[in-house]
Design a protein with these regions (language model features):
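Conserved short loop/turn motifs at secondary-structure junctions
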Residues: 35-45, 285-296
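Short amphipathic alpha-helical/adjacent loop interface patches that line ligand
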Residues: 36, 43, 53, 419, ...
C-alpha cells in the first residue's frame, strides 16, 4: 500500500496578519482621538461663552457708571447755520440764537499791475505787525516774488502769502492765520528799493476782506467772538456758526435718551446672544437627534442659571424700578429678553431713577451683571476653571495617545518579528515536507517493482 502525506504548512501573508492585529491594538487610540475631538469642541464652545460674557460684562459696566445717565445732547433747528454740541456739564435748556455776522480772517492783495518784474522785488525790510507783535523780514536785492512769498510764510507772522495770476500780472495775496479783529495786521516797508513798497499796508496793498469778530445774540444778549467756534460762551455747550441767519435758530439741550436707550438695547442683545447659545448647546435636539456640545456640562448649565437668576432679582436701589421688567425688559420662556418699547421709553424720561437702578453698588442692575462677569471670568471663575480643566484633559489625552502609539509600535515590531520567524519555520517545514514526499514516492516505486 503506497505511503501518503498531507501538505505541511504554506507561505504566510505576514503583513496582512500583523496589520489586522495592530488595528485591534489601535482601537483604544481611536477612542482617545474621538474623545479629544469632543474635548476640543467643548473647549471652543466654552471659549464662545466667555466671549459672549465679556460682551455682557462690558455693556453692563457702561450701564453701571453714573456719568452714562447724565449725558446730554444738543439739537439745532438749523444745523447749517448753528451747530451745537453738548458737554458733560450741560444742563437741560433752550436757547434762541441769531447770527448777525461771522468771524473772518483779514485778506490783503497787491494792487493790479504793481508788480511788473517778478524776478527781482528789490531790497528792504518788511515789518508785519499783529496786535503788539512785530515781525521784521529782511529782503535782499535780487530776491524774486516767489522767494519773498516763501520768506513771509517761514516767518509765521500771522499771515500766509500766495501768488495769484489774474491777467494783470502777478499779485501777492496775504491771508490772516486767525479770525477776529485782534488778528488784523499792518505792514511797514522800510529802506525799500524797487517794487517792495507795493507790499506795505495800508498805504500800498488793498484790503479785500477785513478781520472781523462774529456777532450774535443768544436769548437777546449781544455776543462778540473772535472765532466762529464758541466754547465757554454758554456753559456746557459748544456752538459752531456757519452762516448769518434771517430767523432765530433754536438750540435745545436735553437728556441723551437715544444713547441711554442704545446702551440698554445693547445689553439686551448681549444677554440674548449668550442665553440663546447656552440654551442650544446644553440641550438635546429631538428633531436633529444631535446633542449640544455642552449637554451635561455643569459649568455651562450653571452659567445659564446664574444669568437668568441675576436678571430676575429684584433691587432696592430705586423705589421706581425694582425689577428689569419695570423698564420693559421681560424674560421670555426661551430664556431671552423681550423689550417693551413703550415701557422703556417712559423710563428713559426719568434718567435720575434709571441711574440709581443701574449704578448703585451691589444692588444696581448694571453693577450686578458686571460683578457676575468679574466672577465667572476671573482667575478662579466658573468659565476660567472649566477652560483650564478642558485644556488639562486635552493635554492628558495627548500624553495617553503618545504612550499608546509607542506601545502599538512595540507590539507591531514584536508581531512582525514573531510572524516572520513563523513564516521562516513554515518555509523550512515545507521544504522538509517536499523531501519526505519525494522519498515516499521513491519508496512506492520500489515497492511496486517488488
Amino acid at each position: 500500500m503506497p505511503i501518503s502525506s498531507p501538505g505541511i504548512g504554506s507561505g504566510l501573508d505576514v503583513n496582512s496578519i500583523v496589520t489586522q492585529l495592530v488595528e485591534l491594538e489601535r482601537r483604544p487610540i481611536a477612542a482617545l482621538q474621538e474623545k479629544k475631538t469632543k474635548l476640543n469642541t467643548q473647549l471652543s464652545s466654552i471659549g464662545l461663552v466667555q466671549s459672549y460674557m465679556v460682551n455682557v460684562q462690558a455693556v453692563a459696566a457702561q450701564l453701571g457708571k453714573g456719568d452714562f445717565w447724565t449725558k446730554s445732547v444738543a439739537t439745532s433747528s438749523d444745523s447749517t447755520a448753528v451747530a451745537a454740541a453738548a458737554l458733560a456739564s450741560a444742563v437741560p435748556a433752550s436757547y434762541s440764537i441769531e447770527v448777525l455776522g461771522l468771524a473772518s480772517a483779514q485778506s490783503l492783495s497787491t494792487v493790479a499791475g504793481a508788480i511788473t518784474d517778478a524776478s527781482n522785488m528789490g531790497a528792504g525790510t518788511l515789518t508785519i505787525t499783529r496786535g503788539t507783535t512785530a515781525v521784521p523780514i529782511t529782503i535782499v536785492d535780487g530776491t524774486s516774488l516767489a522767494a519773498v512769498r516763501d520768506q513771509i510764510n517761514a516767518a509765521k507772522a500771522g499771515v500766509t502769502a500766495a501768488i495769484i495770476q489774474d491777467g494783470t500780472g502777478p499779485r501777492l495775496v496775504f491771508s490772516g492765520s486767525d479770525t477776529g479783529t485782534a488778528n488784523a495786521v499792518s505792514i511797514a516797508v522800510t529802506g525799500a528799493t524797487g517794487q517792495l513798497t507795493a507790499l506795505s499796508y495800508p498805504s500800498g496793498m488793498t484790503q479785500d476782506r477785513p478781520a472781523a469778530n462774529a456777532s450774535l445774540k443768544i436769548n437777546g444778549l449781544q455776543i462778540s467772538s473772535a472765532k466762529n467756534n464758541l466754547s465757554g460762551v454758554v456753559d456746557g455747550l459748544n456752538l459752531t456758526l456757519a452762516k448769518v441767519t434771517t430767523n432765530p435758530v433754536q438750540v435745545t439741550v436735553g437728556n441723551d435718551s437715544a444713547t441711554m436707550k442704545k446702551g440698554i438695547t445693547d445689553f439686551v442683545s448681549a444677554f440674548n446672544e449668550i442665553s440663546r447659545y447656552l440654551s442650544t448647546q446644553t440641550k438635546y435636539d429631538d428633531a436633529s437627534k444631535v446633542a449640544g456640545a455642552l449637554q451635561g456640562d455643569r459649568s455651562a448649565v450653571g452659567m445659564l442659571n446664574q444669568l437668568r437668576s441675576t436678571l430676575q432679582q429684584t433691587s432696592t436701589a430705586s423705589t421706581v424700578y425694582t425689577r428689569l421688567g419695570d423698564l420693559g425688559l421681560e424674560l421670555q420662556r426661551d430664556g431671552s429678553i423681550k423689550v417693551d418699547s413703550a415701557k422703556l421709553d417712559a423710563a428713559l424720561a426719568n434718567p435720575a431713577e434709571l441711574s440709581r437702578a443701574f449704578t448703585t453698588l451691589q444692588t444696581g442692575f448694571g453693577q450686578r451683571f458686571k460683578a457676575l462677569g468679574d466672577s465667572v471670568l476671573g482667575t478662579e471663575g466658573l468659565l476660567t476653571t472649566r477652560t483650564n480643566g478642558l485644556r488639562d484633559s486635552i493635554s492628558r489625552n495627548d500624553k495617553d495617545q503618545k504612550r499608546l502609539e509607542e506601545r502599538v509600535a512595540r507590539v507591531q515590531e514584536r508581531l512582525t518579528r514573531q510572524y516572520s520567524a513563523l513564516d521562516g519555520s513554515l518555509n523550512r517545514l515545507n521544504g522538509l515536507g517536499s523531501y519526505v514526499q519525494q522519498q515516499i514516492t521513491n519508496w512506492n516505486k520500489t515497492d511496486n517493482r517488488l
